[in-house]
Amino acid sequence: MSALFSLVAVYVLVCALHKQIKKYASVCYLGSACVSVAVVCVVWSGATKGNFGVRVLLHPLTSASFSTAIFTFVMCASVLKNGLLKQRVMGLRAELAITAAILTLGHNIAHGRDYLVRLCGSTGDLSTGFLVAGAVSMVLVLLMSILAVTSFKVVRRRMGAKTWKRVQRLAYLFYGLTYVHLSFILLPTALRGYIPSVVSYVLYTVIFATYALLRVRKALGKRKGACALCSAAVAVSFVAFVLGASHMVRHTRRAHTERTTRAKARKCSPAEMKDGVYEASAQGHNGKLSLRVTISQGRIEAVTVVGHSDDDPYASWAVEGVSAAIVGAQSTDVDVVSEATSTSEAIIRAVEKILQQPQP
């Protein structure tokens, strides 16, 4: 949902403050840098733990949804129909790109520390999606840095027009890899039925696919058969998108049905278990999550997550919230934590494995 909110917010800001952004670009850069530093401090300090309102408010910044929305307008500006919006965005492409890059760096630094720690350690428990997303992120940071630096007028003048244009063609690779990165981040939770991820992924898919088709059409120009080729591509893409969306909807419904059925069928009772400390693991968003459950006098005394590969601070919210909820309810029939669905479900599945162990 933050993707949709961010796109609307950027649209309003560009329409309302285009003159101020152009005139006071340096102020925008400085403000973006301050916001990035604040995001890093908030994420590293864990200040959002236990405060749902703050998490929701800061999510567009901590998740880079807002900076991605800015890049989306920069990307789509060249293929928009001539009009007021295109005129305003085209006049601000450099300023918007630099601002988005600064904001994105805050996101990269905030979450990059955990990525690097896990990548430098044992990768055996990390999912393929996590490894690919991490590798793509590194390439994106490099491309983004090059494009942002060359967007400054002083650098552009020294490079020369031809060289600058060749470098700026890297933007196409940047946009393509951005969609790949978003897919690896959003698809796992979207396919598990998390509605905000479904909405964001469908929205990004429509935007990036539309841009790609319009960009190809513009590149072909008035060549013979160009319109027919683009029309055919649009038709094929539309059919593919409908089929993919239908599959996602069916998968989402099936996942929801399985969760509902599993919840109804649960007969996991700690009262039937002997006292002791039990261990189990389950697949999280990025890899294996391991935990221990302490049983005493027929009650769950503690649920302790001893290791996971999921992204903080989101995973920490699930570890704190779901673990406490299970202890409080003495059951695994508890709600997942918003924005940490995969980690929440992994905790629940691992505890269920323990409670379903046969007792002598």
Swiss-Prot record:
One MF term in the entry's GO annotations: FMN binding
Record localization: Cell membrane
Main subcellular localisation: membrane
Membrane topology of this protein: Multi-pass membrane protein
GO cellular-component term (any): plasma membrane
Membrane-spanning segments: 26-48, 58-80, 89-111, 126-148, 169-191, 195-214, 227-249
This protein's UniProt keywords: Cell membrane, Membrane, Transmembrane, Transmembrane helix
Entry-linked Pfam families: Ferric_reduct, FMN_bind
Name this protein carries in UniProt: Uncharacterized protein TP_0572
Protein source organism: Treponema pallidum (strain Nichols)
